């Protein structure tokens, strides 16, 4: 009977994120779909060998558990090596400019600055985005400014500071507080040698959790405001949105973000690349992201070594296809209404 009770629990938590509920107790189950897939498979095996269904209700539970397991496999399958890549290598990559980006949530209380500097020196990214940075981290990374003459500094001691280091010229840089007054984002144009700059947006919204926001409404609103901003950018320009989004790529809002922007998640066909929590291998999920427009092609995507943070850094190299115009995706009225409703709810809650 204990197995059937656990089976019912696993069915419920697989379905809860499909509801419109935004409380962290509901949204949190979306993060661990991979882990619950393994638990569902284990319970199915145990039922088959040790407590095979006899009564009608037991058959209903067992079949429902199997259906929930198949559903979760369907959700996470695109983020495996067995799924086709969304982008492919350009026909003539040598004619295109290739640049690189390293993104890392460093954990504000982490003082192992040298570990991040070591990774930066090893991979030599053109762009370096670090999050949860305060004045101590700014000072700890001071030596990098010799190689990165352009720096956007937003030091904060609330675990939402952000610094962007660039080897290239940045223009029209804005530090925005889109939803919450103490959670910044960076919007900038990267001039990497082409007359058409790379549009770069760096974000780190607060998650739904028992220690932070009670619901996902603020996070959802920020991601969708960014999504609307992406739609207003020049379609000739390559676009990248990156950072610790505090959301998994298969969530309703992440998929809604991809739908309204047309941006591509390079995890599709490459793997999960779980980045958090670095200290617990059995409880990791992918929440550090990079989304890119169709005129950007990812060449390399790698999770780097632990730097003492609770997040692993991510490293990307990508080709920029100059001059290729990308059409904005059409969105229906129902999608548009959902986007506006979620934004309004998040802004209202953040007041």
Name each model-derived stretch:
Residues 1-50, 54, 61-72:
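Membrane-embedded alpha-helical segments of integral membrane proteins
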Residues 5, 18-21, 60, 93, ...:
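Generic hydrophobic alpha-helical membrane-segment signal
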Residues 15-16, 87-91, 139, 252-253:
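Intrinsically disordered, low-complexity boundary segments flanking structured domains
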Residues 49-122:
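N-terminal signal-anchor transmembrane helix
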Residues 101, 107-121, 129-351:
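Soluble catalytic domains of enzymes that build or remodel membrane lipids, polysaccharides, and related
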Residues 126:
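Short acidic/polar active-site loop segments enriched in Thr and Asp
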